[in-house]
């Protein structure tokens, strides 16, 4: 048994030795995905999809609470429609997959497989918005999109991925700005409260903003290896798309006005954040609030009379307060321990003959490995408390890591030294895109966001030494 368990654990490369390989090992061994037949595609397996489904359900509930309605738009976009907004199409052109034939017949116009759906929503709005009474339009779509990526990795960057994309139209710039901010706050709430991942909130630089946007807001998370991951974005389009697609309405005075639009999206990329923020060398660690199974009961010496019966009684008891499962298979307990540690199930519940005799169970935390003996009469209450403790600890641990990995640089020598240590660097910037490009060229770090809270760590730009305009968080990123 010991040898089998050891071999099971050895399938994971230590993150300290090779973080990229550790990530790949966890994704595979935790049974989250398999590789698709086309390069860059993935099969999200039942356990991986169950986690995504819990994330999706929470987010969908939040959307509906803020008045949004779900819709489903086509997968295909005519080339002529995609090209209507110049900046937008240029931003996506290298990644677009094209349909050129229908059966044996060559199409007269190429059809894009949607990389995103702005132009489809704009075309719809141009035909369905006529009066101020038609506003606002608050739509969200769950679906998949295709972006023909050159370098791929499961969840983080794939040629096809699942996501939601919200598209809204408003009468005024102020309403659109309010919507852009509200949806970023919605993402931040989801990621921090449910995924236990702390995020930075801020605005993208003009160089990094979404193609065709007036401005882009972002949440940025820090991974265990010190790299950043953009985890959700919200875009204010102003009237740019409305002018390109002639989306106008008559206001209360009978005057024609262009609508103000937003879009916002969060994808299965957030699964990558979940893995790389909380995972360890034993595998995945899933926060209780989104865990498909919050507690797994493992009977010990289950072949002995009465053990399985008591374990199933316990399951029925705990199922009233949490998502609970039981492994009644004939696999050895050690194998089961490793299996559910690998899958990151928040709490393991052990029950054997001695525990039954003492009317107790053993609760084992996935995040710390700590064990505690709990009377059966108190186990429901204690499990609920313990799940809350695990959730809070995962968030605090990730926040402490981010704080430890956030430093300040006042000149390029200091910047170059600190970027090698990983993490976020707070540095002043003059606002000139040439400095932003120089920093990327010299260090491979990119601007992650201009934070909401104004802060000054120096008077001059970290790159050129001229008068600084604002503070920027920089990092190497996925």
Curated annotation (Swiss-Prot):
This protein's record includes keyword Lipid metabolism: no
UniProt keyword terms in alphabetical order: Aminoacyl-tRNA synthetase, ATP-binding, Cytoplasm, Ligase, Nucleotide-binding, Protein biosynthesis
Enzyme class: ligase
InterPro entries referenced in this protein's UniProt entry, alphabetically: aa-tRNA-synt_IIb, aa-tRNA-synth_II, aa-tRNA-synth_II/BPL/LPL, Anticodon-bd, Anticodon-bd_dom_sf, Pro-tRNA-ligase_IIa, Pro-tRNA-ligase_IIa_arc-type, Pro-tRNA_ligase_II_C
CDD domains documented for this protein: ProRS_anticodon_zinc, ProRS_core_arch_euk
Pfam families assigned to the protein according to its UniProt record, in alphabetical order: HGTP_anticodon, ProRS-C_1, tRNA-synt_2b
Molecular function as annotated in GO: ATP binding; catalytic activity, acting on a protein; proline-tRNA ligase activity; transferase activity
Subcellular location: Cytoplasm
GO biological process, one term: prolyl-tRNA aminoacylation
E.C. no: 6.1.1.15
Comment text on domains: Consists of three domains: the N-terminal catalytic domain, the anticodon-binding domain and the C-terminal extension.
PANTHER family: BIFUNCTIONAL GLUTAMATE_PROLINE--TRNA LIGASE, PROLYL-TRNA SYNTHETASE
Assembly notes: Homodimer.
Homology family: Belongs to the class-II aminoacyl-tRNA synthetase family. ProS type 3 subfamily.
Function: Catalyzes the attachment of proline to tRNA(Pro) in a two-step reaction: proline is first activated by ATP to form Pro-AMP and then transferred to the acceptor end of tRNA(Pro).
Protein name: Proline--tRNA ligase
The species this protein was found in: Oceanobacillus iheyensis (strain DSM 14371 / CIP 107618 / JCM 11309 / KCTC 3954 / HTE831)
Gene from which this protein is expressed: proS
């Amino acid at each position: 048994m010991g040898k089998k368990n050891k071999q099971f654990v050895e399938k994971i490369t230590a993150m300290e030795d090779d973080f990229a390989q550790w990530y790949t090992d966890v994704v595979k061994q935790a049974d989250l995905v398999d590789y698709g037949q086309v390069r860059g595609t993935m099969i999200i397996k039942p356990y991986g999809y169950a986690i995504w489904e819990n994330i999706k359900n929470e987010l969908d509930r939040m959307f509906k609470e803020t008045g949004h309605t779900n819709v489903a738009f086509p997968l295909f976009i005519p080339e002529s429609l995609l090209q209507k907004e110049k900046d937008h199409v240029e931003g996506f052109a290298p990644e677009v997959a094209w349909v050129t034939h229908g059966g044996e017949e060559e199409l007269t116009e190429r059809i894009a497989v949607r990389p995103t759906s702005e132009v489809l929503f704009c075309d719809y709005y141009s035909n369905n918005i006529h009066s101020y009474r038609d506003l606002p339009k608050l739509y969200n779509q769950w679906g998949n999109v295709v972006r023909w990526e050159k370098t791929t990795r499961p969840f983080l960057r794939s040629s096809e991925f699942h996501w939601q994309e919200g598209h809204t139209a408003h009468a005024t710039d102020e309403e659109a700005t309010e919507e852009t901010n509200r949806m970023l706050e919605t993402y931040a709430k989801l990621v921090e409260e449910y995924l236990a991942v702390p995020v930075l909130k801020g605005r993208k630089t003009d160089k990094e903003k979404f193609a065709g946007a007036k401005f882009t807001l972002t949440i940025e998370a820090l991974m265990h290896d010190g790299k950043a991951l953009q985890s959700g974005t919200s875009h204010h389009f102003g009237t740019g798309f409305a002018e390109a697609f002639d989306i106008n309405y008559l206001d209360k005075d009978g005057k024609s006005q262009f609508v103000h639009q937003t879009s916002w999206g969060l994808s299965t990329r957030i699964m990558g954040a979940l893995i790389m923020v909380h995972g360890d060398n034993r595998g995945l660690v899933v926060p209780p609030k989104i865990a498909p199974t919050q507690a797994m009961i493992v009977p010990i010496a289950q072949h002995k009379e009465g053990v399985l019966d008591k374990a199933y009684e316990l399951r029925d008891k705990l199922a009233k307060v949490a998502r609970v499962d039981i492994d009644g298979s004939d696999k050895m307990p050690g194998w089961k321990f490793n299996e559910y540690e690998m899958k990151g199930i928040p709490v393991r519940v052990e029950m054997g003959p001695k525990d039954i005799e003492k009317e107790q169970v053993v609760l084992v935390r996935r995040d710390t490995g700590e064990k505690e003996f709990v009377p059966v009469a108190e186990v429901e209450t204690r499990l609920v408390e313990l799940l809350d403790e695990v959730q809070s600890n995962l968030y605090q641990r990730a926040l402490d890591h981010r704080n430890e990995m956030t430093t300040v640089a006042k000149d390029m020598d200091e910047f170059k030294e600190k970027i090698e240590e990983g993490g976020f660097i707070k540095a002043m910037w003059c606002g000139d895109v040439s400095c932003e490009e120089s920093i990327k060229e010299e260090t491979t770090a990119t601007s992650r966001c201009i934070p909401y809270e104004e802060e000054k760590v120096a008077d001059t730009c970290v790159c050129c030494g001229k008068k600084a305009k604002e503070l920027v968080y920089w990092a190497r990123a996925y």
